[in-house]
UniProtKB/Swiss-Prot annotation:
GO biological process, one term: translation
Organism this protein belongs to: Flavobacterium johnsoniae (strain ATCC 17061 / DSM 2064 / JCM 8514 / BCRC 14874 / CCUG 350202 / NBRC 14942 / NCIMB 11054 / UW101) (Cytophaga johnsonae)
Family: Belongs to the bacterial ribosomal protein bL19 family.
Annotated keywords: Ribonucleoprotein, Ribosomal protein
Entries under InterPro entries matching the protein: Ribosomal_bL19, Ribosomal_bL19_sf, Translation_prot_SH3-like_sf
UniProt keyword Transmembrane present: no
The protein's role, per its UniProt record: This protein is located at the 30S-50S ribosomal subunit interface and may play a role in the structure and function of the aminoacyl-tRNA binding site.
HAMAP family, A to Z: Ribosomal_bL19
Protein known as: Large ribosomal subunit protein bL19
GO molecular function terms attached to this record: structural constituent of ribosome
Disulfide bond sites: none
Pfam families named in the record: Ribosomal_L19
Example of a GO cellular component annotation carried by this entry: cytosolic large ribosomal subunit
Keyword Kinase attached: no
Amino acid sequence: MADLLKFVQNEFVAKKDFPDFGAGDTITVFYEIKEGEKTRTQFFKGVVIQRRGSGTTETFTIRKMSGAIGVERIFPVNLPALQKIEINKKGAVRRARIFYFRELTGKKAKIKDKRR
């Protein structure tokens, strides 16, 4: 059964070429929104909190501050509405899931840049 799922995922799911990113990176996600007859492109810029899953069920969570309110959005990697992902900044974190980032405020909420 697992082999059948892998076969279907590999054959029929369209692979998109997104850059490699992980927790702590600041990225901008451009996605398409349909409002009635019109379609427009909207972007969501924030810090990646986690990546989870594999294959067709892989998702990533982005957090941004809108005023004083934190907004999180979960995107499936294989979402057809995703147009492109830009990496704005690589962050140096030691965890794969940085949920502690939700409680941090002010200068503590800054993520250091990854050294090259």
